[in-house]
């Protein structure tokens, strides 16, 4: 949707008319006869009696026209009233076209200036929004690249990450360890009878024979060694 075209305020139009009088000053001073417009300008309250007397004090027609333009520039309705007076005189109608063309030219310049200011005020915002969007996209891509790199570095393919591992250990392994620790403590606290103690079950015959044989063999092994040592002495 197109933005509405800028329009001139009353202050802008007053400035345009003032600039038009200034640009046409030399031309109008040569063409205008100030005394012909006194009556109409005084009737419209643009000039006072003292103003007309001040203008009449000038020695030449060009100076009187210049002083008249000074008063017209000070009044927002000065140029419009001068055009009305020229139209009433019907002797210098070509001045109306000259003044109108100058006003329209300055008006268009003013509009173009306002349009340029409006566009320049919008451009930084749009550029900033685009930069912010691109910056956000680049940040997101950089973050995803970093996450992907960390995943490849610390968690090779086929290996789960550490966070799920510890969460699984805390939820599954810890209860098992606690149960095992409880059972071990119960078994260690209970005292079992040794072989030969009252209440201990009898040994199997094979184990009794092996135990007896080992004792006999041990005595036989040491006695010859002791006798050999004595014989050498």
UniProtKB/Swiss-Prot annotation:
Protein species of origin: Mus musculus (Mouse)
What name does the UniProt record give this protein?
B-cell lymphoma/leukemia 10
Residues found modified as N-acetylmethionine: 1
Q: Which domain of life is it from?
A: Eukaryota
Q: How is it modified after translation?
A: Phosphorylated by IKBKB/IKKB. Ubiquitinated via both 'Lys-63'-linked and linear ('Met-1'-linked) polyubiquitin chains in response to T-cell receptor (TCR) activation. Ubiquitination is recognized by IKBKG/NEMO, the regulatory subunit of I-kappa-B kinase (IKK), and is required for TCR-induced NF-kappa-B activation. Linear ubiquitination at Lys-17, Lys-31 and Lys-63 is mediated by RNF31/HOIP; linear ubiquitination is recognized with much higher affinity than 'Lys-63'-linked ubiquitin by IKBKG/NEMO. CARD11 is required for linear ubiquitination by HOIP by promoting the targeting of BCL10 to RNF31/HOIP.
Chain positions of site Cleavage: 228-229
Region described as Disordered: 185-233
Q: What is the protein's known function?
A: Plays a key role in both adaptive and innate immune signaling by bridging CARD domain-containing proteins to immune activation. Acts by channeling adaptive and innate immune signaling downstream of CARD domain-containing proteins CARD9, CARD11 and CARD14 to activate NF-kappa-B and MAP kinase p38 (MAPK11, MAPK12, MAPK13 and/or MAPK14) pathways which stimulate expression of genes encoding pro-inflammatory cytokines and chemokines.
> Which InterPro entries does this entry report, sorted A to Z?
BCL10/E10 (IPR033238), CARD (IPR001315), CARD_BCL10 (IPR042143), DEATH-like_dom_sf (IPR011029)
State where composition is biased (Pro residues).
Answer: 195-205
């Amino acid at each position: 949707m197109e933005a509405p075209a800028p329009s001139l305020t009353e202050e802008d139009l007053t400035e345009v008319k003032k600039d038009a009088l200034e640009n046409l000053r030399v031309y109008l001073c040569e063409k205008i006869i100030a005394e012909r417009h006194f009556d109409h300008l005084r009737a419209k309250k643009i000039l006072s009696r003292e103003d007309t007397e001040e203008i009449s004090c000038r020695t030449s027609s060009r100076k009187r026209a210049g002083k008249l333009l000074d008063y017209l520039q000070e009044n927002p309705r000065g140029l419009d009233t001068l055009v009305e007076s020229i139209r009433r005189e019907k002797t210098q109608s070509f001045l109306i076209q000259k003044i109108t063309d100058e006003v329209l030219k300055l008006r268009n310049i003013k509009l173009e200036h306002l349009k340029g200011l409006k566009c320049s005020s919008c451009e930084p915002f749009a550029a900033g929004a685009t930069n912010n969007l691109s910056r956000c996209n680049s940040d997101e891509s950089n973050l995803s690249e970093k996450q992907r790199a960390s995943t490849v570095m610390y968690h090779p393919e086929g290996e789960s990450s550490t966070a799920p591992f510890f969460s699984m250990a805390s939820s599954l392994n810890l209860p098992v360890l606690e149960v095992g620790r409880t059972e071990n403590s119960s078994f260690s606290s209970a005292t079992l009878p040794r072989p030969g103690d009252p209440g201990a079950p009898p040994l199997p015959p094979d184990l009794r024979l092996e135990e007896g044989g080992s004792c006999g063999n041990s005595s036989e092994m040491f006695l010859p060694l002791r006798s050999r040592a004595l014989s050498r002495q």
